[in-house]
Amino acid sequence: MKQEKHGVLLVNLGTPDAPTSSAVKRYLKEFLSDDRVVDTAPLIWWPILNGAILPIRSPRVAKLYQSVWMDEGSPLLVYSRRQQRALAARMPNTPVELGMSYGSPSLAEAIDKLLAQGVTNLVVLPLYPQYSCSTSAAVWDGVARILKGYRRLPSVSFIRDYAEHPAYIAALRQSVEHSFAEHGQPDRLVLSFHGIPKRYARLGDDYPQRCEDTLRALTATLPLAPERVMMTYQSRFGREPWLTPYTDETLKGLPAQGVKHIQLICPGFSADCLETLEEIKEQNREIFLKAGGEKFEYISALNDEPAHIDMMQQLVAQRF
């Protein structure tokens, strides 16, 4: 009887290959063409995407990427690679590969590498702590689509999410408490999650509930009164209503309520990226300070912190 061999596929969203208009355009086209992300009918959406959004947004977004690009590359890819290497070091007998839903390294490349190493039991870990149809489900679709091309399939274990997992909450708590120790306790701790259209939630996506589960679990562990911890949603796109309260509008209004010092963490982002380093750390910081705020500290994503890798190892080991 052939011995089973486990392998791990870490998945994140993806990133352009370079901070250029052409690279950003390629990436955005792939990303925004996924009907899990934008479910508008193709006959309506494609002319909008190709005729307006890509030509207008690509140069603008490229400039934003240039402001956060690291020597090693895109922050999301840099931190994701570090996560992969750190987890692989913890599990020397288990192949660990990284794949992105959009861009490079692709899911197909990662799965090919794992199966070429004889993996018979594949554990898929989408690095989205809170399930959403637009992220986690898109990973499911991608993995299934790729495996359809194989005659011999591995067993597949798919980790839906980990919004309340004790090791995840412990890693967040450690990060927040480190910030408190360095900067003092803020008037408000803001948890900013990526938003989704309200319509997606009405149609059954339980993402808002999973964000609230994380908020509740983390708040219970912190040395801060619950009324001083709040949740918002960022990165809205398009004209239809998204989940509220919006992060930027909330930060603009807080100083008028006497809130002068905030610390902000983005628990839904497993690695720092454009949305955290530019949108939050730069744009939203400026919004808060211009509105009369005095102190703003961004608490980094968990990235490759040891507690985060501990969590990944626990999640994966539970599927072996």
Swiss-Prot record:
Quick one: which pathway?
Answer: Porphyrin-containing compound metabolism; protoheme biosynthesis; protoheme from protoporphyrin-IX: step 1/1
Group of enzyme by EC: lyase
Disulfide pairings? none
Q: Which GO terms describe its cellular component?
A: cytoplasm
Q: Which residues form a coiled coil?
A: none
Binding annotation for Fe cation: H194, E275
Source domain of life: Bacteria
Q: Name one GO biological process term.
A: heme biosynthetic process
Where is it mainly found? cytoplasm
InterPro entries this protein is in?
Ferrochelatase, Ferrochelatase_AS, Ferrochelatase_C, Ferrochelatase_N
Alphabetically sorted, this entry's keywords are: Cytoplasm, Heme biosynthesis, Iron, Lyase, Metal-binding, Porphyrin biosynthesis
Q: What is the protein name for this chain? A: Ferrochelatase
- Origin species: Serratia proteamaculans (strain 568)
The beginning of the lineage is: Bacteria, Pseudomonadati, Pseudomonadota, Gammaproteobacteria, Enterobacterales
Q: Which gene encodes it?
A: hemH
